Each structure stands twice: as structure tokens, then as C-alpha cells.
Amino acid sequence: MSVLDRLTALFKTPVQREIKPLPATDVPHALGALLVRVALSDKQYAVQEIGQIDRVLAKFQNIGPIDAAKLRAECERLEAFAPNTPDFAHLLRKSVDYADRLGIVKALWQVVYADGALREVEADVMEITQSQLGIKSQDCAAAQADAQNQAAIDNASNLSS
């Protein structure tokens, strides 16, 4: 490396030096990016949401917590540069059967409720996503209610700990 190359490298931002290629948008990455996008929709990325995303990815991919965290990190990068939410949902709709898409909707609601609050912008993103996933409205309502009930149970057990 020449002196000029070394000097040029010093003036590059850390982001410019560490750019890695984005992962392919396959089903696991599309799911993870959707989870991250829903969590970020209220402009707050709570640690509870991050933990819930890791648990969902671990469950859906049958991987351990460290691999789930690595997958989430890839999905965070993908989400930042990826197309709009309906494109992720469309990929999942094409690739995943109805029962699994319904499971995805429930997982998305679990992330929404992980921080203990439902904000209007999150509800709006969920409405669009559920529609793009092709989930019936009564199934969406049931998935939301299940996630909300589970969040209440989780919050109550955390308070008593």
C-alpha cells in the first residue's frame, strides 16, 4: 500500500472502511428485516424489541441465540438499505404458506408489544404488512390479541421477578 493510499484511508469515514455487502434477501432475511422495520417504525429501538426479534429469529430458523443475534445484525443492515415494507411482505407471501405467514404476523405483533406500548405508526405499518402478506382480517385480529396477551403476561412476570 502506497503512502497516498494510506493517507486516503485515514480520511475515509469508518462506515466507508467497513462496508460489507448486503445479504441476499431470502426468506430469513426478509423476515428479520420486517421485524426490525416494525421495531424501528416508532423511531425507538428498545432493547426489549431487540430481544424479541432475536427470540423470533431463533425460533423460526431453529438456531441458537448467538446465531440469531448475528442474523438480526445482518437484517438491520438490510433493513437500512432495502426496499419498502411491501416488497419484503411480497417476498414472504410468495415463499411462505398461509399458516407460516400468520405466524409471522403474530411474531411482528410480539415485537410491537415487546416495549409495552402500541403506537399509531406501528399499527399503520402492521396494517400495511398484514395486507401485503395476504392475511385475513379476523386472523390478524386474533394474532394481535394473542401477542398483546402474551406481552401482558411477560410484563407481569418481569415485574414480579
Predicted segments, located by residue:
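Small-residue-enriched hydrophobic alpha-helices in membranes
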Residues: M1-R37, S41, A46-S161
